[in-house]
């Protein structure tokens, strides 16, 4: 099967799509590639299940190690559960797709993207996003597309489209933008304190290219004779709709105008109104048109009641400029923070509160051996900074079974990690592995940005010398026709009933992370610009509150933190320090109660429970790698005896010979009369000859030299 191939020009990094060749039973399938990176994307649709009241969309992203010419490790030698990076790419595909499906659609939808080939010049994620749009269109699923995504990086002072991994790493910007014909649908960015104006310019630059990719998809569909499927929402019985609106409008409006600060009180009041309407419907005769409509659609009441609440909340914001808790549109909720909230056994801790959102962040410092090993398709082989986010059910007052972290928790942790990574000290200056855990103790919106703020304080409480503190705010949007209102520091109900969740994190100098998700089909860049600009004073206000509690990292690490010392050894001496079968390094570790990690470049990191042990272990390794010179004094161990003298191990793997005449001031008849195998004796190097042979003596050693040798012995 030959299939249909098309090339989409893209700034020198063309995209090739192959249709009608792979996965012929899938409703829509495409192989999309750039360079040697190729992603197979499929889309399928199944009939709606009974009782579903949401859009059942599942997006899966999978990586096959054969894509990079590798065989998986482990006993089974096959891929297991998706690595974290694959989960994040799955979310990256899902987030711009989801708002473009009709929200009333109840058919089961599944999009599967599989990276089948990978090179270092073309990351697969943005290809998968664009490929998902094409696959959905080919599957003839109702969709407000086309949609496409590009990545923007910085090379010098120039923005580039779809940069290589190396260009991303060097440039200080990793921005992914997805867009539809209506505007930008999704933004995901990590940056090295990029000024707001530059970030806005980069988003605008990306969307101009996205327009071309959208047009290319339209041209492709036209050539295939395929129309984009649009569909009208199912009709709602006006009798039931009017009944609910007439009874809900005034009570809901009154509740929203109470300006209640506590969401639980507000939610309880709204539930009471909905419950009263439900009771009134239940009391109607069975043949009443309202009762009949409610019986035919049991989920109509909660759906329509939500619609009334949404309409009135949005109306209040647009017409009166006031929010349900009484705040102005650009006002941040009350903030209070505290550091050192846990006992000193914990390395660093902080509690961050904003309104009813509360996050506790805890920092732990570890050795290089604690770094997370990565076994996926991406260039990084390990991570020294880990940020984990937990969202237990009690944070929203619910009772649910505890499960392993889901996609949302992994995504929020990755966002906080991305926000803080640019301000962390380089490992050459601070060799610790850093783990921060953000525990959401109470949630009323913007918990991910609460994690960023709490984690900044926690890191400083642990004595991590971050370059600058980072704060974050979540921005929202209400859009009705041409009326647009940007909301600062959104709470739960504004996120739930609003049109946008736009998280902005950064320092006082610029942005370190962005994440924008939409519930509408797109926004002009001008509106995004307004949101980014409105976020800055909010971030600085939050930062001021944080710094009032702790304005800089503590000068000392906590007593409970391990002590790390580093030293550089020549790479050709790594084997000497490790020893045969690891004997030497294991001996040092056991003797001084330390962990020793050695990089391929010869950087030795010693992790110890206290500074004394660390220094002793460092002295031992320095002794191992020290060049032996005439006049040096060592405490050595006798390893062999021959008639004319004895061999003495000075350092692991380094022996010298002491002649029988150099064993004592007096004449020695037999070597065994003076020393035995296993004896520890103090010796001085007489000479190192041209062949590297070491000649020793026990004569002429000052008592102070002997004592120093005993103190620094490594044999």
From Swiss-Prot:
Its cofactor is Mg(2+). Residues 631-699 form the S1 motif domain. This is Polyribonucleotide nucleotidyltransferase. It comes from Thermosynechococcus vestitus (strain NIES-2133 / IAM M-273 / BP-1). Keywords: Cytoplasm, Magnesium, Metal-binding, Nucleotidyltransferase, RNA-binding, Transferase. The keyword Nucleotidyltransferase applies. One of its GO terms (biological process) is RNA processing. HAMAP family: PNPase. It is found in: Cytoplasm. Mg(2+) binds at residues 495, 501. Belongs to the polyribonucleotide nucleotidyltransferase family. Its EC number is 2.7.7.8. Its main location: cytoplasm. InterPro entries: ExoRNase_PH_dom1 (IPR001247), ExoRNase_PH_dom2 (IPR015847), ExoRNase_PH_dom2_sf (IPR036345), KH_dom (IPR004087), KH_dom_type_1 (IPR004088), KH_dom_type_1_sf (IPR036612), NA-bd_OB-fold (IPR012340), PNPase (IPR012162). The keyword RNA-binding applies. PROSITE patterns: KH_TYPE_1, S1. It is an enzyme of class 2 (transferase). SMART domains: KH, S1.
